[in-house]
Amino acid sequence: MTATALAQRDFTAVIGLEVHVQLETDTKIFCGCSTRDNNAEPNTRTCPVCLGLPGALPVLNKAAVEAAVKVGKALNADIAEKTQFHRKNYYYPDLPKNFQISQYDAPICSDGQLSISVEDNRREVAIRRAHLEEDPGSLTHQGGNIDTAEYTLVDYNRAGTPLMEIVTEPDFRSPAETRAFLNKLEEVLEYLGIFDPTADGSLRVDANISLIPTEDIDNGSITTAALESANRTEVKNISSHKGAEKALAYEVTRQRNAVERGRAIEQETRHWDESRGITVSMRSKEAEKDYRYFPEADLPPLAVADWKDQISIPELPDARRERFREEYKLDSESAAKLTSTKAVADFFESVADQFDPALAATWVADNLLGELNYRDMTVGDIDDRFDEFTQLIELVDDEDITTKNAEEVVLRRMLDDELTPEAVIESEGLGRADEDEVVTAVTGAIDESPEAVEDYHAGEGGAINFLVGQVMQKTGGSADPSKVNTLLREQLEDKK
């Protein structure tokens, strides 16, 4: 086909993801080495098993299997009655054994799905499979990137960390959809308590991208023949949701430009260079046969059926969001904020147990989360100060302090200076003004603002707001605005 003919055809991007999730366990998947100290010196959290030394035998970590079953249940996947491990053979510096213990034709989970929303359109993404494997070591390129470095250092501390690889069907049609999926997946994993999103390298993505002629797509479905006839590019080294969207946007554009120029899309593996914002060719893409899979003889088949029903999962984000809307009468935006992580949802429910849910939602969703985000903090950072936070809400609810002062002064100093609410109120002199002080301030504001008084009597609504502001200024913000409004109207009516 000529370049002109190619340029006239309409193509659709077809994307599938392979998401590598580090499971949060105390030890590695096949040995007793710790996974907890991410700041350990390089190559100190290792043993003969994770270094692949002769004679060392793997022992499966039960906690990793339990975590995998939880993922399967959360994804509504079929969980295998019996599963098996295989050796995936390839040579790379971060793989000390020259093979990776993974799963081939007997994954622990298959045929799942995950709901996502993109621009208010909700749909299901099909999960082809999810299997357990061990993480390789990590590489640090010195003096450049992967293709320009002077040399590369290898750290095997990560080798053997439990990984779950979640493989989607090629269900994505845009980079934005992949970002929405990764956001949702991370949210679910955090709720399960098996994943730490703050850990370095805890979620890494490989993406497969093809351009398919739009006429070969029927109602969103793509024929097997169309998929098999299109050359596919795999992009590696994606380590964030935002990075995934950027990498895929670049790669889709690169492929479109190539097609429009009449060039063939090479079937290859490319590396996402985040610093330069481009993908770089690494090698021709391996076929499945290149890995020479065969059963791992040192690990017997695993009968998951014997205990998978004993493994439970918590209420998941979508269900909790819906419950919050119904039980606490929250709007969709507030419910989404308050269920963004399990820790936030738990925190809110603890506050809502003590106060009106609407008040609790306002304070947690609008005030607290905003101040925490500004400081790059999370709810987990103030878990031990829960009583102080509820005390602040109680002071506002009892009208011992104004909402404005509580939000703009007390809460901020509580977080910045680690002070109690009482300490901030005392140091800033923020206690409520007594009634005599407020009456005096009201009288003064009226006497000093004859134009505003005249405007009020002329029916101009803004005049009363101006006078309230004057009183609040005189009382240092310690008066109750609603009471000030009432007192002002009373005195103004008396002056008619």
Curated annotation (Swiss-Prot):
SUPFAM superfamilies referenced in this protein's UniProt entry, alphabetically: GatB/YqeY motif, Glutamine synthetase/guanido kinase
EC number(s) given by UniProt: 6.3.5.-
PROSITE patterns hit by this protein: GATB (PS01234)
Region listing for Disordered, in residue ranges: 475-496
SMART domains: GatB_Yqey (SM00845)
Subunit structure as annotated in this protein's UniProt entry: Heterotrimer of A, B and C subunits.
PANTHER family to which the protein is assigned, alphabetical: GLUTAMYL-TRNA GLN AMIDOTRANSFERASE SUBUNIT B MITOCHONDRIAL AND PROKARYOTIC PET112-RELATED (PTHR11659), GLUTAMYL-TRNA(GLN) AMIDOTRANSFERASE SUBUNIT B, MITOCHONDRIAL (PTHR11659:SF0)
UniProt cross-references to NCBIfam families, sorted A to Z: gatB, PRK05477.1-2, PRK05477.1-4
Protein name: Aspartyl/glutamyl-tRNA(Asn/Gln) amidotransferase subunit B
Gene, per the UniProt record: gatB
